[in-house]
Every structure is written in structure tokens, then in C-alpha cells.
């Protein structure tokens, strides 16, 4: 289990100067050719998403203005707050900030031939499904994960096991992404 606080994470500026990324985790850890990766991006200007052949990307708008996503003949989609949207990461996708204001989003990318991610928003106590990897990010409220208290802009990632997240207040929201491995693949094969 690895814990993080978005406010304390290192920031990598994009080459096109349109935004920045905070990498949460990758699997396998510290590998350039990852099977899955979670990150948070701040987008300050219109531009294109980086291409990642053979990957699927799920983007969830966390805050800021809505974002219009356009991919030639594939789709036109308005990204709304806390509504995950999946697309092939090898498609050219243009992002336009519809309100002209900076947006922040959660990204999870998975290698299509190895694993699949699901992203959802939780508003009550739950236990993970025993997936072989996952990430949680607190949008608001106070949550307990094991003996650790997580509050706004904090989270955790893990590479296996079942975990219970307890909401400690009457209300709270948390982004949860689980990783499931496709038949014939296992994280045990790469560690």
C-alpha cells in the first residue's frame, strides 16, 4: 500500500506547456513500459492528449470547467465532473476547455492486452473486490483505510488484496479505480 497527498507530489510540466501531471503510481513500479498507470493532470490550455499505443485511458474530471473531447471519426464528448470516460489512448484526442478555465482530471491507463480498469465514485463505506490493483482519491470527506485517515486530495494505491474504506462523516466522495487482469495475465508474473 502506498499513500499520497496531491499537494505534496512532484509536478511534471508538459512539453507543450498546456498542463502538468502528478504521477500517482505505475505497475510494475518505476517501469517506463507500464501495464497500468494512475495520475492527476492539470490542464491550463486547449491541446492534444499524448498518444499511448495499445493503451486505454479513463479520464475523470475532478474540478474546473467542463472539457470537450474530440477524436476525428471516433467521438465527440463533453467531460463532466465525476463522470469517467474511457477511450483508446492511441487515438488523437483534442481537449478544449469549454469554460476557458483550468481543469483537473484523474487519469488511469491500462495496457489493453493485459488488464482493464474500472473507475467509479463512492459515497459510502465499501470493500474493494479483491482486484489485483487499485487507486483511491478522496474528493471530499474523511475516509479510513486500514489505520490511515485520508482526507481531501489524499489517496492510496495498492497492487493486490481486499481493502475496506470507511466513510467517517455523514457525507463524502471518493474516486475508486480497480484493476483486473485479463485471462492468462497476473501481476505475479512481472514482479
Swiss-Prot record:
The lineage of its organism: Bacteria, Pseudomonadati, Pseudomonadota, Gammaproteobacteria, Enterobacterales. Belongs to the Ves family. The gene is ves. Disulfide bonds: none annotated. NCBIfam families: PRK11396.1. This is Protein Ves. Gene3D superfamilies: Jelly Rolls (2.60.120.10).
Amino acid at each position: 500500500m502506498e499513500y499520497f497527498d496531491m499537494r505534496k507530489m512532484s509536478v511534471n510540466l508538459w512539453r507543450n506547456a498546456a498542463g502538468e501531471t502528478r504521477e500517482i503510481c505505475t505497475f510494475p513500479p518505476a517501469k517506463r513500459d507500464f501495464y497500468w498507470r494512475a495520475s492527476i493532470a492539470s490542464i491550463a490550455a486547449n491541446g492534444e492528449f499524448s498518444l499511448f499505443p495499445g493503451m486505454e485511458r479513463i479520464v475523470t474530471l475532478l474540478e474546473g470547467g467542463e472539457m470537450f473531447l474530440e477524436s476525428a471519426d471516433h467521438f465527440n464528448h463533453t467531460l463532466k465532473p465525476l463522470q469517467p470516460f474511457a477511450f483508446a489512448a492511441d487515438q488523437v484526442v483534442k481537449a478544449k476547455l469549454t469554460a476557458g478555465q483550468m481543469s483537473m482530471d484523474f487519469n488511469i491507463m491500462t495496457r489493453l492486452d493485459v488488464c482493464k480498469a474500472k473507475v467509479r465514485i463512492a459515497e459510502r463505506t465499501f470493500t474493494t473486490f479483491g482486484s489485483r490493483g487499485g487507486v483511491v482519491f478522496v474528493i471530499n470527506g474523511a475516509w479510513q483505510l486500514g489505520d490511515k485517515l485520508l482526507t481531501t486530495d489524499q489517496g492510496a494505491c495498492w497492487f493486490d488484496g481486499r481493502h475496506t474504506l470507511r466513510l467517517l462523516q455523514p457525507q463524502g466522495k471518493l474516486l475508486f479505480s480497480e484493476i483486473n487482469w485479463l485471462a492468462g495475465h497476473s501481476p505475479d508474473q512481472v514482479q
